[in-house]
Regions:
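A charged, well-structured terminal subsegment
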Residues: 135-163
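NAD(P)-binding Rossmann-fold cofactor-contacting core
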Residues: 25-28, 35-55
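Mid-chain, well-packed structural core segment of small domains
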Residues: 73-113
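Rossmann-fold NAD(P)-binding glycine/threonine-rich loop
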Residues: 108-134
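Glycine-rich, highly charged phosphate/nucleotide-binding loops
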Residues: 1-3, 54-90
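A short helix->loop->beta-strand "cap" motif at the edges of active sites that frequently abuts
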Residues: 40-42, 99-104, 122-124
């Protein structure tokens, strides 16, 4: 599941995204992704057993707890975005299936064929070794040196951003 049309459809349809392994530390890649998702209209659900709140959102210790808490509000998790090691993925695939997610997304460097096969067999879309932030920016406009779309085309890095 990595054709441009499929990625675009997944990113358009999946509006509530649980970010498993989201870090409360501002300089971590997962934190950047969480902020990006919020800034682009997604409902981002932090999942990290070591935190109670990240980026102003309540944080849950595991995926099933998050899904149960959100279900009381009438919200379902559409995508599970995983910032975990490849070997940690099979139990997360089981959790994604159990909560009724539509897509299991494994971040850059994360590939696990066993987890992918489980998820696909249950009807989930699977994306491996790709970053949600990068793919969204690439497919919907928004990539440049600073990670945002300045609408300026140049091969030279600007001294200052024009906004």
């Amino acid at each position: 599941m990595s054709t441009i049309e499929t990625l675009r459809r997944v990113l358009h349809e999946c509006r509530t995204i649980a970010v498993v392994g989201l870090s409360p530390q501002w300089h971590r890649p997962s934190h950047f992704v969480g902020k990006y998702l919020l800034a682009h209209g997604y409902r981002m659900v932090p999942v990290n057993p070591m935190a109670t709140e990240i980026i102003g959102e309540p944080c849950y210790p595991d995926l099933r707890t998050a899904a149960t808490a959100l279900k009381t509000q009438g919200i379902t998790i559409d995508m599970v975005d995983c910032f975990r090691k490849s070997e940690d993925m099979p139990p997360l695939a089981d959790d994604a299936i159990a909560i009724g997610a539509k897509c299991l997304w494994m971040q850059l460097g994360v590939v696990n064929e066993e987890a992918a096969a489980k998820a696909r067999a249950a009807g989930l879309g699977v994306v491996m070794d790709r970053c949600v932030k990068i793919e969204h920016a690439r497919l919907f406009g928004g990539l440049n040196w600073a990670g945002v779309n300045t609408r300026v085309i140049s091969a030279k890095r600007p001294q200052q951003l024009p906004y």
